[in-house]
Amino acid sequence: VHSHPGGLPWLSEADRRLQIKSALPWWLVCRGDIHKFRCVPHLTGRRFEHGVTDCYTLFRDAYHLAGIDMPDFEREDDWWRNGQNLYLDNMEATGFYRISLPSAQPGDILLCCFGASVANHAAIYCGNGELLHHLPEQLSKRERYSEKWQRRTHSAWRHRHWHASAFTGICNDLAAASACM
């Protein structure tokens, strides 16, 4: 447990490096509130394993670092080919509302159709034409929100408790991961 008196309720870049090194959950006291952070792997450089470390896990862990906890869903590989629509069926129930793509801000979720007609891939919009995501058979990464990804984008979503400063928790992890390389 440590505190950020008068600071932000997210782990700093140094906090994230030390948390990863300790492999322990961290508790942060800020403005009289206790914020609990599971020790999740850095958001970039993760190996893909469907249902364990996939695009939803990245989305869930990024939001955790931003102070919003998301449920974990049991999901079989290729669920989108079996008539399921897990993202669209769960976004509103977990606190998200649909926004127009031009109004997307850093931290908003982009649902994409990746080799499917159903929204089966989630990415976190980072602003400045970048997204953070995790594709099968690749390491999780930041990349340009290119025309290819714009064509695949099904919809954009924002959490009802999101505020712009929450993206700091995600950025601090990205910076901490870069410093570790």
Model-derived features with residue positions:
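...with weaker cross-activation on analogous glycine-rich loops/strands in unrelated enzymes
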Residues: 76-140, 145-146
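Active-site nucleophilic cysteine motif
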Residues: 49-66
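Short helix-to-loop capping/linker segments positioned immediately adjacent to catalytic or ligand/cofactor-binding
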Residues: 43-51, 98
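Divalent-metal-activated hydrolytic enzyme cores
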Residues: 19-41
